[in-house]
C-alpha cells in the first residue's frame, strides 16, 4: 500500500514459515523511503529478524523491521531514556544491552564497547517464546525458535539463501544492491 501522506510504498511477504507452539516465519518487508539502506536483503528491504542497536556517546538507536527506529538519549548518570510515552526502555549490564517493550518482549544485544553496532542475541516474550540468533563473524547465520531453525547463506554481504530445518529454502538474487528475484521452495519466482 501507499501512504497517502508521505507517498511511501510499503510491502511485506512471508516466504517460509515453520509451525509450532510459536511459529518461526521468514517475512520480507520493503519500504520505499528506506531505499538507500541495505540490511543484507537489498536496498529498502528488511526482514522480521532485522534488529540492530547502534550506540555512541550520546544516544542509542534501536532499529526494527519495517524501518522503525526508537532513539534513546544517554542521561548524565549513564542510563538511557527514550522519548516520553515510548513503549521501550533500555538497560545496560556489564555484558549486554537489554531493551524491553511494555508488552513484555525483551531484546538482548551483546555489549561491545569497541563497536558502535551491537549484535542481537535473543528476543523473548512473556508467553515463553524465544528466538536465539547465531553468527558467523558479523553476519547472522541462523535464528532458532520453538518451531525450528532458519539458516542464512551469504554471498558477500547479501543473503542468497534462507533454509528452514525441514530442508525447504528460498533463493535470493541481486543486481548490485538491488534484490531482483526470489525463488520459493517450489521453484517459482
Q: Where does each model-flagged region fall?
A:
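Extended charged/polar low-complexity repeat regions
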Residues: 4, 26, 32-34, 43-45, ...
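Boundary/junction segments of secreted and surface-exposed precursor proteins
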Residues: 1-11
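Short aromatic-glycine motifs in intrinsically disordered, low-complexity regions
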Residues: 9-19
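Predominantly extracellular/luminal regions of secreted and cell-surface proteins
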Residues: 17-29
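Compositionally biased, low-complexity segments of secreted and virulence-associated proteins
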Residues: 1, 19-21, 140
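A secondary-structure micro-motif
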Residues: 50-52
Amino acid at each position: 500500500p501507499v501512504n497517502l501522506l508521505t507517498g511511501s510504498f510499503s510491502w511485506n511477504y512471508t516466504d517460509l514459515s515453520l509451525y509450532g507452539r510459536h511459529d518461526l516465519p521468514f517475512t520480507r518487508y520493503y519500504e520505499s523511503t528506506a531505499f538507500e539502506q541495505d540490511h543484507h536483503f537489498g536496498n529498502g528491504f528488511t526482514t522480521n529478524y532485522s534488529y540492530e542497536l547502534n550506540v555512541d556517546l550520546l544516544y542509542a538507536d534501536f532499529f526494527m523491521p519495517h524501518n522503525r527506529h526508537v532513539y534513546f538519549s544517554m542521561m548524565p548518570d549513564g542510563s538511557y531514556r527514550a522519548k516520553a510515552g515510548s513503549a521501550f526502555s533500555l538497560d545496560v549490564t556489564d555484558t549486554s544491552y537489554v531493551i524491553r517493550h511494555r508488552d513484555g518482549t525483551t531484546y538482548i544485544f551483546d555489549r561491545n564497547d569497541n563497536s558502535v553496532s551491537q549484535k542481537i542475541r535473543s528476543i523473548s516474550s512473556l508467553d515463553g517464546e524465544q528466538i536465539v540468533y547465531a553468527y558467523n563473524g558479523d553476519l547472522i547465520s541462523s535464528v532458532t525458535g520453538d518451531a525450528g531453525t532458519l539458516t542464512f547463506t551469504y554471498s558477500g554481504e547479501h543473503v542468497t539463501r534462507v533454509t528452514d530445518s525441514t530442508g525447504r529454502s528460498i533463493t535470493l538474487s541481486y543486481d548490485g544492491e538491488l534484490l531482483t528475484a526470489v525463488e520459493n521452495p517450489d521453484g517459482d519466482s
